[in-house]
Curated annotation (Swiss-Prot):
Keyword Transcription regulation set for record: yes
Pathway(s) annotated for this protein in UniProt: Amino-acid biosynthesis; L-arginine biosynthesis [regulation]
Pfam families, A to Z: Arg_repressor (PF01316), Arg_repressor_C (PF02863)
HAMAP family: Arg_repressor
Lyase found in the keyword field: no
Compartment(s) where it occurs, according to its Swiss-Prot or TrEMBL record: Cytoplasm
Job of this protein: Regulates arginine biosynthesis genes.
Classification of source organism: Bacteria, Pseudomonadati, Pseudomonadota, Gammaproteobacteria, Alteromonadales
Family (UniProt): Belongs to the ArgR family.
Protein name: Arginine repressor
A single BP term in Gene Ontology: protein complex oligomerization
Coiled coil: none
Keyword field: Amino-acid biosynthesis, Arginine biosynthesis, Cytoplasm, DNA-binding, Repressor, Transcription, Transcription regulation
Length: 156
C-alpha cells in the first residue's frame, strides 16, 4: 500500500476504525491507521480529527474507555437527536447542571458553548455524563435555565 492516500480515504478509514470501539488512546488509533497504509499519520493529526468529528471517550460493552463517534457527525444542532441524550436540567443560585447519557456530556457542552454568551452561557465544563454551565450573569440564571431547557425540549 502506498505511504500516502487521499483525505477521503483517510476520513473513511478513521471513522471505520472508531466504530470498532476498541481504541482507548490516540497512539492506538495512529498505529491502526498506519497499519492501514497511512504512513504519514501522527498523534497531532489524530487529535485534530477526533476534535473535528466530535469523537468522545466512553465505555464500550466491556466497560473499557474507548474513543467513539457520535451518531450524528459534525456540529450538532438543537433539532438533532442530541436532545434525547439530556436526562435532567437543574440549577442553584449560581450554576446550571445538565445530566446526560453516559459519554454524551462533551458533545452537548460543545453545542451549549456554540450558542454562548448571547443566550446567557459564559462557559461549560463537561465530564462523562454531567455538564456545569456558568451563566453569564447570576441575575439572569432563570432565563438561561429556560433557554437550556427549551434547547432540549426538557420540562420538569
Amino acid at each position: 500500500m502506498p505511504a500516502t492516500r487521499n483525505q477521503d480515504e483517510l476520513v473513511r478509514t478513521f471513522k471505520a476504525i472508531l466504530k470498532e470501539e476498541r481504541f482507548g488512546s490516540q497512539s492506538e488509533i495512529v498505529n491502526a491507521l498506519q497499519a492501514e497504509g497511512f504512513g504519514n499519520i501522527n498523534q497531532s493529526k489524530v487529535s485534530r480529527m477526533l476534535s473535528k468529528f466530535g469523537a468522545v471517550r466512553t465505555r464500550n460493552a466491556k466497560q473499557e474507555m474507548v474513543y467513539c463517534l457520535p451518531a450524528e457527525l459534525g456540529v450538532p444542532t438543537a433539532g438533532s437527536p442530541v436532545k434525547n441524550l439530556v436526562l435532567d436540567v437543574d440549577h442553584n443560585q449560581a450554576m446550571i447542571v445538565v445530566r446526560t447519557s453516559p459519554g454524551a456530556a462533551q458533545l452537548i457542552a460543545r453545542l451549549l458553548d456554540s450558542i454562548g454568551k448571547p443566550e446567557g452561557i459564559l462557559g461549560t465544563i463537561a465530564g462523562d455524563d454531567t455538564i456545569f454551565i456558568c451563566p453569564a450573569s447570576i441575575k439572569t440564571i432563570d432565563e438561561t435555565l429556560e433557554t437550556v431547557r427549551s434547547l432540549f425540549n426538557y420540562s420538569e
